[in-house]
Amino acid sequence: MNVIEDFRTGEPITLHQATNSVEFESVPNPLYMKLLWFERYGPIYQLKIQIRFNYNLRRALNLHKCWIELTITGSNRILTGPRFLKVLKKRLEIYLDNLGLICINNVIRGLNHVLYEEFNFVSSVIQNQSVAMNLY
């Protein structure tokens, strides 16, 4: 099992830190998604997405930095590149809005739900996190 660690100290994030949450409606535009690269190999494509927590969300959750990088392999002809990013963001926001709370664990659960249960064309996902808690 992949344990989320503080990249500066190397210590695992505690349960309290990972589940420390704030109401979804209280933070406008809490997640920033960026398409790093996209490549197509015939019917198969691969893309890398970076998800960043915005400043207001990081301040509310006492985070210095929180990035999640996803390398996704799939086989949809229509939903690729920027369109895939837009649909992923919308579905993730709907999932988090239904929960009502946003935290590190809920974002990861939401990504797993959207990528593995709603998108049936995604074949594999490699996920890396870069999290740093406020030390002061």
Curated annotation (Swiss-Prot):
The keyword Coiled coil does not apply. Keywords: Host-virus interaction. Changing residue 120 to T: In strain: Infectious clone pBCT028. It comes from the Viruses. InterPro entries: Gemini_AL3. GO terms for biological process: rolling circle single-stranded viral DNA replication. Homooligomer. Interacts with the replication-associated protein (REP). Interacts with host proliferating cell nuclear antigen (PCNA). Interacts with host retinoblastoma-related protein 1 (RBR1), and may thereby deregulate the host cell cycle. Oligomerization and interaction with PCNA are necessary for optimal replication enhancement. Belongs to the geminiviridae replication enhancer protein family. Increases viral DNA accumulation. Enhances infectivity and symptom expression. This is Replication enhancer. It comes from Beet curly top virus (strain California/Logan) (BCTV).
